[in-house]
Design a protein with these regions (language model features):
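Rossmann-like flavin
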Residues: 93-203
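Helical element adjacent to the flavin cofactor pocket in flavoenzyme catalytic cores
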Residues: 209-260
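C-terminal segments that line or cap access tunnels to active or ligand-binding sites in enzymes
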Residues: 315-424
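Short beta-strand to alpha-helix junction loop
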Residues: 163-172, 214-235, 384-392
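A conserved FAD-binding loop/helix module that cradles the flavin
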Residues: 55, 464-486
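Mid-domain catalytic core of redox enzymes
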Residues: 249-365
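N-terminal glycine-rich phosphate/pyrophosphate-binding loop and immediately adjacent elements
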Residues: 2-137
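A glycine-rich dinucleotide-binding beta-alpha-beta segment and adjacent secondary-structure elements
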Residues: 182-196, 346-352, 406-468
Length: 488
């Protein structure tokens, strides 16, 4: 019987785990090295501009609402959000633009016309992606892949009976290229590989299901911005009696005879019947479990992509931009080869611009916008980031200024910069990778670290570096899996 739990890290996975355990009557403590909750999902303000620091895309809101419903609370009283009518604005170097509607039929009608693509190509693609999701959701996303009982259920038999459906023998790019005729449409759907920090030229065709989450379920924005997800779950956890200790660094997970006893913090040991690490799995082993060898297969796994992010206060409004904006590169393949083969950034690269002031006007002064400008980069292998950031900044400004027909440099009212080394420093993400390990192999789902220790009893893992993967929705599901495992 587990009566007490200690969660290391107050990221989105840690918060969701603490909530689920507290609902069951378990006394939960959360220790967090930073002075605030949220991990990557935080916010800050400069000169009247508010910025969401980390994840900017919100899908599957029902998985947030589930936590309130489990606690017998009305989600509408504590967490409000709205669906976006336009999912994303896409821009290509030849000045082609496509403002992607969220509704499927509207998307197909507009995309077919813009790209001279047959409507049935889209509908067939969406149907196959939906089938993949429905067949594998229970098996791959909502259960541990490292327990025998998972593979003995009817869901497994059903999933295995449709192996050809998953396109595991193809890359995502190959699956997209075989379905669409226009290279721009292929590039648009290739982009979804970046949602888990992978390359469309390496990750499997299974990953067409990623776009299903956005296309079928929609894209949303919380009232007040992405940070409201963190704040609402933090308040829910406190109402449930979860005890938080901020500015508190975990030093070691204490064990005896391969069983968890608690966590050492400074000169104190917080005792607990179970420990859940929301910390990246690599530093969990390296820093907190020195008494055990770090699993070599975890350290050797290829990290996902990282990012350099420029937070710019822009003293002008751009009506042609929306909440989510993508400025594509000319050569997508070269871009990903640079990232994963050369651990570099290509000369021509894709730029993502997120502007929450489009939906939350108070996020920027009147007549201005808050730009979150992101470029995918390799993880930190010791590159000269100072030189790279300087180069990226100049090239981003040149690219966006050209495509928006406006000199952006004089419009920058304030600036903050986030690099992979800073990401690791602030969030303990190994090498600054945003999603733990990459999914550049067809077997990636099975190679991610399980949500429990196979050696240490009552030690569990949640968050983006373990099963089922990175991103807000999957971090929330990792909490659900830990909750179920801890009942055993």
């Amino acid at each position: 019987m587990k009566n007490t739990a200690l969660v290391i890290g107050a990221g989105i996975g840690g918060l969701a785990t603490a909530i689920r355990l507290a609902i069951r009557g378990i006394k939960v403590k959360v220790i967090e090295a930073n002075g605030y909750p949220g991990g990557k999902l935080t916010a800050f303000e400069i000169k009247g501009y508010r910025f969401d620091a980390g994840p900017s895309l919100f899908t599957m809101p029902q998985w947030v609402l589930d936590l309130f419903l489990l606690a017998n609370e009305d989600p509408k009283k504590h967490f409000k959000y709205k669906r976006k009518k336009v999912a994303c604005h896409y821009f290509w170097p030849d000045n082609t633009q496509f403002f992607a509607p969220s509704e499927r039929d509207e998307f197909v009608a507009k995309a077919a016309k813009t790209f001279n693509e047959k409507p049935q190509n889209f509908f067939q693609y969406f149907k196959r992606a939906e089938k993949k999701f429905n067949l594998t959701r229970s098996l791959f996303l909502e259960q541990s892949l490292h327990k025998l009982k998972t593979f003995l259920g009817t869901d497994t038999l059903k999933a295995l009976a449709h192996l050809n459906t998953y396109e595991l023998h193809k890359t995502l790019h190959q699956a997209n290229e075989q379905n669409f005729n226009n290279p721009k449409v292929v590039q648009l759907f290739d982009r979804f590989a970046t949602y888990n920090g992978s390359s469309p030229y390496q990750t499997s065709g299974m990953m067409t299901l990623i776009q299903h989450l956005e296309q079928h379920y929609g894209t949303y924005i919380p009232e007040g911005g992405m940070h409201q997800i963190t704040l609402s779950l933090f308040e829910l956890a406190k109402r449930l009696g979860v005890e938080f200790h901020f500015n508190t660094m975990a030093e070691q997970i204490i064990t005896d005879q391969n069983k968890v006893l608690g966590v050492k913090v400074s000169q104190t040991v917080f005792k607990a019947d179970m420990v859940v690490s929301n910390m990246d799995v690599v530093p969990t082993y390296v820093k907190l479990l020195p008494q055990y060898p770090t699993p070599k297969k975890i350290v050797k796994q290829e990290p996902s992509s990282a990012a350099v992010i420029f937070y710019w206060g822009i003293a002008k409004e751009f009506p042609q931009l929306d909440l989510h904006n993508i400025f594509f590169s000319t050569n997508y393949k070269a871009e990903f080869e640079a990232l994963f083969q050369n651990h570099a950034v290509a000369d021509d690269f894709t730029v993502y611009v997120n502007i929450t002031s489009k939906e939350v006007p108070k996020d920027a002064p009147k007549g201005c916008e808050n730009w979150f400008v992101m470029v995918n980069t390799p993880a930190d292998y010791g590159q000269d980031w100072e030189t790279l950031v300087e180069s990226l900044r100049a090239r981003i400004l040149a690219k966006l200024s050209r495509q928006l027909n406006t000199d952006l440099e004089p419009l920058i009212a304030c600036e903050e910069i986030l690099t992979p080394p800073l990401i690791e420093q602030k969030t303990q993400s190994y090498k600054g990778a945003l999603y733990g390990s990459s999914s550049n192999k067809a077997t990636a789902a099975f190679l991610r670290h399980p949500n429990f220790s196979q050696r240490i009893k009552n030690l569990y893992f949640c968050g983006g570096s373990v099963h089922p993967g990175g991103g807000i929705p999957l971090c929330l599901l990792s909490a659900k899996i830990v909750d179920e495992l801890s009942k055993e």
